[in-house]
């Protein structure tokens, strides 16, 4: 299994899936869903990205956990993507199904998962979502594997009533995350630099930027972040529902390589 190397500040590209069978907006052509995902994944690989994460972005309105009828399709697409690229692959099962995410990653040879609410409580458009750290560790013990858990702190599209510093510490010390993710308020929105700096100061594990990465802020974020999850700016014309733009993806790779001295 190929893993992420946080010493090299990995660029992780988001493969936003089209609506899956069983989701409200599924269009009826499953092969198109698979082909779209593979194309975006290959574009990230060609551009020089360090990893990809597959998420069921098209399945909104989301449920807190994945409906059973969606899970097989998600697994099939993830396996098809894994077969076509050699990059480390992650899974994010929206809105917060850490058990399914881990199970799919384990089944398809994934390297990591993203969990939106690992600890604490988030008030979201799906209602109140509670952390799932203990349930996740139970599954890890049952099926094994060395899949990393990257956990959001004060995840986007949600309201939080905890102190950010305490939330970081809880995610690291009590949730046992392998890395934490700092995001803006909504998909594609830039993060608070103050939050990133604070997270780096109090966290003993890698800190990733999870939204709003673009050429204008990349150099500044690079000073502090241990990795980047990118999904909006790299799309054609910066529109999230468009395919990944090879040229835009290459721009970030060139910037990263320059800053790394490669």
UniProtKB/Swiss-Prot annotation:
Family that this chain belongs to: Belongs to the BtpA family.
InterPro entries in the record: Aldolase_TIM, BtpA, RibuloseP-bd_barrel
NCBIfam families per the UniProt record, alphabetical: thylakoid_BtpA
Top-rank lineage group of the source organism: Archaea
Protein name, as recorded: Uncharacterized protein PF0860
């Amino acid at each position: 299994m190929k893993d992420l190397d946080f010493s090299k500040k990995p660029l992780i590209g988001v493969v936003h899936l089209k609506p899956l069978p069983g989701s409200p907006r599924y269009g009826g052509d499953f092969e198109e869903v698979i082909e779209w995902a593979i194309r975006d994944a290959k574009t990230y690989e060609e551009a020089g990205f360090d990893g990809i994460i597959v998420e069921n972005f098209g399945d909104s309105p989301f449920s807190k956990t994945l409906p059973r009828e969606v899970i097989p399709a998600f697994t099939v697409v993830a396996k098809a993507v894994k077969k076509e690229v050699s990059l480390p692959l992650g899974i994010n099962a929206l809105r917060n199904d850490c058990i399914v995410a881990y199970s799919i990653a384990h089944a398809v040879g994934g390297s990591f998962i993203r969990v939106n609410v690992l600890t604490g409580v988030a008030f979201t458009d799906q209602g109140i979502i509670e952390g799932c750290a203990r349930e996740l560790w139970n599954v890890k013990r049952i099926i094994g594997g060395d899949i990393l858990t990257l956990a959001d702190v004060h995840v986007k599209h949600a309201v939080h009533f905890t102190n950010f510093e305490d939330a970081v510490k809880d995610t690291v010390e009590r949730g046992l995350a392998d890395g934490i993710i700092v995001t803006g308020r909504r998909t594609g929105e830039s993060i608070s630099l103050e939050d990133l700096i604070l997270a780096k100061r109090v966290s003993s594990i890698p800190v990733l930027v999870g939204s709003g990465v673009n050429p204008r802020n990349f150099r500044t974020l690079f000073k502090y972040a241990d990795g980047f999850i990118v999904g909006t700016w790299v799309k054609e014309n910066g529109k999230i529902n468009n395919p990944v733009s090879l040229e835009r993806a290459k721009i970030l790779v060139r910037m990263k390589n320059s800053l790394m001295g490669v």
